[in-house]
């Protein structure tokens, strides 16, 4: 026969289990590392910010003398901070395995708030931003694909990249009611100036170090952004070589992603910051 104490603990355990099922956000989220922070008032630190990101996600070994994203992480998810001031900071939710941005957090009405792309599952979202709870955890109506972002925020070529542009996009959304167009514009800038810049030296080198300067996203940049996997695969599939600087030779040459034509691994290395994990 169950004692009163045993009955109590049985009921308590049952309630805790039920509560965790119907309130998944109540489960403790892991403590995630902030792998890099960018102070938008100090734009000269931008390239070191990008270098820090590459260092955090890079494998210990290289492929054809090119850094590559690691296959394994102690923690797969992390944060990256974009700082406007002591009272305005956007924190990006990052998947370390590919540097995908999954969402962001800010403060609204003195409470933590988080937005996630439409295609981010609840199981993944629950790893991030434990300070944002209940109705302050919001699923966006669009995904993180460039197709969705450009549909809602304008074409990449019409959204120049620059430190002030990024700062202004944060000011436009921080603590304010969700606005699809403004949020999509923010993501277009943040994804290209953080994730794509870490993936491609060509892009990171294009971002001006002066706060009020900007660069138009041209067809060379979008071609790289749309073909990271293709270029990475070409490097992984290359053959050993004793005559090239990278010790590698493309198995199939050239690799064409219009308007780019890459005839050697060395040419790919010139634009690449990180290879996609194999």
From Swiss-Prot:
Job of this protein = Inhibits viral infection of plants, and protein synthesis in vitro.
Name the UniProt record assigns to this protein: Antiviral protein MAP
Query: Which Cys pairs does UniProt list as disulfide-bonded?
Result: 64-248
Tell me which family the UniProt entry assigns to this protein: Belongs to the ribosome-inactivating protein family. Type 1 RIP subfamily.
Listed GO molecular functions?
rRNA N-glycosylase activity; toxin activity
Species of origin: Mirabilis jalapa (Garden four-o'clock)
Q: Does the keyword Hydrolase apply?
A: yes
Q: Which domain of life is it from?
A: Eukaryota
Family matches, as InterPro entries:
Ribosome-inact_prot_sf, Ribosome_inactivat_1/2, Ribosome_inactivat_prot, Ribosome_inactivat_prot_CS, Ribosome_inactivat_prot_sub1, Ribosome_inactivat_prot_sub2
Broad class of enzyme this protein falls into: hydrolase
**The entry's keywords:** Antiviral defense, Disulfide bond, Hydrolase, Plant defense, Protein synthesis inhibitor, Signal, Toxin
- Per the UniProt entry, the Enzyme Commission number(s) are 3.2.2.22
Question: Catalytic positions?
Answer: 196
Q: Which reaction does it catalyse?
A: Endohydrolysis of the N-glycosidic bond at one specific adenosine on the 28S rRNA
Q: Which SUPFAM superfamilies match?
A: Ribosome inactivating proteins (RIP) (SSF56371)
Q: Does the keyword rRNA-binding apply?
A: no
Output the GO biological process annotations, alphabetical, semicolon-separated: defense response to virus; negative regulation of translation
Q: Pfam families given for it?
A: RIP (PF00161)
Q: Which residues form the signal peptide?
A: 1-28
């Amino acid at each position: 026969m169950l004692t009163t104490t045993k009955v109590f603990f049985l009921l308590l355990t049952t309630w805790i289990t039920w509560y965790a099922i119907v309130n998944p956000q109540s489960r403790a989220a892991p403590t995630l590392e902030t792998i890099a922070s960018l102070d938008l008032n100090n734009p000269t630190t931008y390239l070191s910010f990008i270098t820090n990101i590459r260092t955090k996600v890079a494998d210990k070994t290289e492929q054809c003398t090119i850094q590559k994203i690691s296959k394994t992480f102690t923690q797969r998810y992390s944060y990256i901070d974009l700082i406007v001031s002591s009272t305005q900071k956007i924190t990006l939710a990052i998947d370390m395995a590919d540097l995908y941005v999954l969402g962001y957090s800010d403060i609204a009405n003195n409470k933590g708030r988080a937005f996630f792309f439409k295609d981010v599952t609840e199981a993944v979202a629950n790893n991030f931003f434990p300070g944002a709870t209940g109705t302050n955890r919001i699923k966006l109506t669009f995904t993180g694909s460039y197709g969705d972002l450009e549909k809602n925020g304008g074409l990449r070529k019409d959204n120049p990249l620059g430190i002030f542009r990024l700062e202004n996009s944060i000011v436009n959304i921080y603590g304010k009611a969700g606005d699809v167009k403004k949020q999509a514009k923010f993501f277009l800038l943040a994804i290209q100036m953080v994730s794509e810049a870490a993936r491609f030296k060509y892009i990171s080198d294009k971002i001006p170090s002066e706060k009020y300067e900007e660069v138009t996203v041209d067809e060379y940049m979008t071609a790289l952004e749309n073909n990271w996997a293709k270029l990475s695969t070409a490097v992984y599939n290359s053959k050993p070589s004793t005559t090239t600087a990278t010790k590698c030779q493309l198995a199939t040459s050239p690799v064409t992603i219009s308007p780019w034509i890459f005839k050697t691994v060395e040419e790919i290395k010139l634009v690449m910051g990180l290879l996609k994990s194999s």
